[in-house]
Curated annotation (Swiss-Prot):
Pfam family, one: DUF2292
Highest classification ranks of the organism: Bacteria, Bacillati, Bacillota, Bacilli, Bacillales
Protein name: Uncharacterized protein YezD
Length: 55
């Protein structure tokens, strides 16, 4: 079993920043051997469709 380690404050700040700047989407954190190795931010932009009036 891997010993408990602390998370680098820079990594925590990156995660918080990703969450604060995200309106819609996901933040995915990848972990290897109990260490955060990657943070992915996928942002979604949604557009409402305007329907044309029929004649």
């Amino acid at each position: 079993m891997v010993s408990k380690s602390t998370i680098d404050p820079e990594v925590i700040e990156k995660i918080i920043s990703s969450l604060e700047t995200l309106d819609f989407g996901t933040v995915q954190i990848t972990v290897h051997d109990s260490q955060i190795t990657q943070i992915e931010k996928i942002e979604k932009h949604r557009f409402s469709l305007k329907r044309k009036e029929s004649k």
